[in-house]
Regions:
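Glycine-rich, basic loop-to-helix element that forms the pyrophosphate-binding segment
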Residues: 66-84, 105
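Short, flexible, basic/aromatic active-site loop/helix in glycosyltransferases
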Residues: 138-174
Length: 320
């Protein structure tokens, strides 16, 4: 059995994937085999990645899998997990650059803490500024906090805020970003793989919640550093920053998450809380030119996506 397998999902990001692979060059190939799963990219990703592997004699140490479908982030990772044979599995976004020693630190963290099921690094921008990567679980009340984006409401419900403050100390978050996370293989044996009905987004929150319910905890090691460029294959973060309309799959995943873990009434409460916050945001906007709203285009309608059937299979983006 290998010590840890590294799984990278590629979807139309061959240059990023190659750069990510280059950052792993210091790692012992015999102990850390790499698996790249291409989610049926419609471009020449396979050719470009294959060419890089050929030119650098990496075909024996990197397994490139061409999936016959693009079934999302969870499905791609599950494909890699199913062919791995290691004590630990590292899920790694293609838009990441691993700093020297980071993966070894994460592996040692789990080896020294057998009660921990997952370990996450400090995600950072290329200039070294840290990113939020440790969180509390999304609960219905969080929808009020986010949509209102108003100081007094945030202060009242601060203990429910999803992002944890960035810290240089060891943390034990409820969930962590899957841009880079090391998972003990025993966790998959205990709770199963990632839920493939989440096309993209909320699959990490869901997995961490299931893991915690099974008795596994998460540890964040701030001494391990990984650059996260963000948004390599998804427009959600850039669209949200511009307050543009978010893709349907985001709202499908949101509805599925709240329904799965809080029931239909929990999903209803989440949506009502969001609308209450929306009213607060509209009032704030009337009286303050400097107020920055979190409301995206048509979000008041899109949050009700799949409300009547939140467990329904997602609609593939190609079929919108």
């Amino acid at each position: 059995m290998d010590r840890a397998s590294v799984i990278i999902i590629n979807y139309k990001t061959p240059d990023l994937t190659v750069d990510c692979l280059k950052s792993l060059s210091e790692m012992d190939v015999s102990s850390f085999p790499r698996i790249i799963v291409d989610n049926k990219s419609p471009d020449n990703s396979i050719d470009l990645i294959s060419d890089y592997l050929n030119r650098n004699n990496l075909n024996d140490s990197v397994d490139l899998i061409a999936s016959d479908k693009n079934a999302g982030f969870s499905s791609g990772n599950n494909t890699g997990i199913n062919v791995s044979n290691s004590e630990f599995v590292l899920l790694l976004n293609s838009d990441t650059i691993v700093r020297p020693g980071a993966i070894e630190l994460l592996v040692k963290t789990l080896e020294e803490n057998p009660q921990m099921g997952m370990a996450s690094p400090c995600l950072e921008w290329p200039d070294g500024r840290p990113q939020e990567s440790c969180f509390r679980f999304h609960r219905p009340i969080n929808e009020l906090i986010r949509s209102a984006a108003t100081g007094p409401i945030t202060k009242i419900f601060h203990r429910y805020e999803v992002p944890l403050r960035v810290s240089d100390k060891v943390l034990y978050p409820e969930w962590t970003s899957f841009a880079c996370v090391l998972i003990r293989s025993q966790v998959f044996e205990d709770i199963g793989l990632l839920d493939e009905e989440f096309f993209m987004y909320f699959e990490d929150v869901d997995f961490c919640m299931r893991a915690r319910e099974a008795g596994w905890n998460i540890i964040h090691n701030p001494d391990a550093h990984v650059v996260h460029l963000r948004g390599g294959s998804s427009p959600v973060k850039s669209q949200a920053a511009k307050k543009k309309r978010l893709p349907r799959y985001f709202y499908e995943s949101r509805s599925r998450y709240y329904y799965k873990h809080f029931g239909r009434f929990g999903l209803f409460r989440a949506n009502i809380y969001w609308h209450l916050g929306w009213v607060v945001a509209m009032v704030r906007k009337l009286f303050s030119r400097n107020y920055q709203s979190n409301i995206c285009e048509k979000q008041w309608r899109d949050i009700w996506t799949n409300f009547c059937n939140p467990a329904a299979p997602y609609i593939h983006p190609d079929n919108y």
